[in-house]
């Protein structure tokens, strides 16, 4: 599991928009679920894909619980929490602000494709959606981020 720790934490840190404490909690929950479910791993997908899917599900469940309780102050996955081009400090736009304009699905696709160098097929497996949908999310994400500049 040690070989997957850094990549998984980086993935979760980006999903949580830099919230280190939440990242630690989600990573711990992910590894606990993996340990408990290890016998059910069938080997159909690569282990890393299975691990990231569990992590993504943990994040998604966290977001859903926050929304249901009305506590989603960070706006995880909330496209309404967008940044206008006029809010940018000169020409430097940091990654966190770029990620905030994306929906949860777009952000996940971007992180997996550009930061983790995952192929489209693996991203589709992790996100449980067709490859064409992943490509659409990436395309929309690029368009949204381009508007910021």
Predicted regions and their residues:
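Amphipathic, Lys/Arg- and hydrophobic-enriched alpha-helical face
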Residues: 1-20, 37, 99
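Residues within the DNA-recognition helix of helix-turn-helix
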Residues: 4, 137-140
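Short, Lys/Arg-enriched C-terminal cap helix and immediately downstream tail that follows
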Residues: 64, 139-149
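Internal acidic/polar
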Residues: 61, 68-95, 99, 119
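Arg/Lys-rich amphipathic alpha helix in sigma70-family domain 2
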Residues: 36, 40-43, 53-73, 88
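A short pre-motif secondary-structure segment
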Residues: 109-113
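Structural recognition of an alpha-helix C-terminal capping motif at a helix-to-coil junction
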Residues: 25-32, 45-57
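Short, charged helix-capping/linker segments at alpha-helix termini
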Residues: 10-29, 131, 148
């Amino acid at each position: 599991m040690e070989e997957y720790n850094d990549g998984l934490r980086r993935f979760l840190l980006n999903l949580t928009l830099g919230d280190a404490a939440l990242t630690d909690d989600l990573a711990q929950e992910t590894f606990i679920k993996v340990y408990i479910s290890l016998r059910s791993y069938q080997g159909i997908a690569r282990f890393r894909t299975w691990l990231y899917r569990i992590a993504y599900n943990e994040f998604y469940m966290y977001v859903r619980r926050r929304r249901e309780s009305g506590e989603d102050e960070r706006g995880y996955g909330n496209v309404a929490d967008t940044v206008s081009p006029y809010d940018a400090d000169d020409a430097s736009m940091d990654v966190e602000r770029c990620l905030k304009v994306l929906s949860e699905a777009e952000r996940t696709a971007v992180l997996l494709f550009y930061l983790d160098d995952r192929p489209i097929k693996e991203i589709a497996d992790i996100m449980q959606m067709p490859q064409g949908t992943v490509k659409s999310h990436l395309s929309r994400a690029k368009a949204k981020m381009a508007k910021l500049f």
